[in-house]
């Protein structure tokens, strides 16, 4: 919440691309390329999937600093619908979507703003196993597009399968940091947070 500006930082500094954004309001951070996807539903419930995405595109500007033309909006809309595999539900009203469909629509809306970083709050919460796999694949797509992804989630296994670097936070303090394989074998982390029964696959084997 401190990173996106929802609450004021009581210490330290927050940098984005080398710029101090600690005291900037949310909208300024968004203009700099920082997008936040909350755990709660963030779609416009009464709008269709395509209108949800279009609403964000209509606020964007092109390389010349001018609002996107109708042609540019339609081209980007079609591209996002294809990339997130939601062409088949484009005319569905958002309130009728499943958990996985809603997540994909929300991520498409986030991408419509051409972000540099996307913060995902509990992306694996409230969705079925198939949707979890789809979301992991979408996050990989974001990484391939060179978009930074910061995830906060209590689903440790799915998060470990997805991230390159992780922090384990306990009682407001960073308990440990490192790659998932290291953290899964960290005795302190297992004792305080993961539990002794926790297993995580490394090099094809369960620990």
Please identify what each model-predicted range represents.
Residues 4:
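Helix-to-loop junction immediately C-terminal to a conserved catalytic motif
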Residues 12-19, 32:
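Conserved ABC transporter NBD signature motif
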Residues 47-56:
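Short coil-to-helix segment of the ABC ATPase nucleotide-binding domain corresponding to the Q-loop/switch region
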Residues 68-89, 137-140:
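Conserved ABC ATPase "signature" region
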Residues 93-97, 101:
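Conserved ABC ATPase signature
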Residues 114:
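Conserved catalytic motifs of ABC-family nucleotide-binding domains
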Residues 118-122:
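Catalytic Walker B motif of ABC-type/P-loop ATPase nucleotide-binding domains
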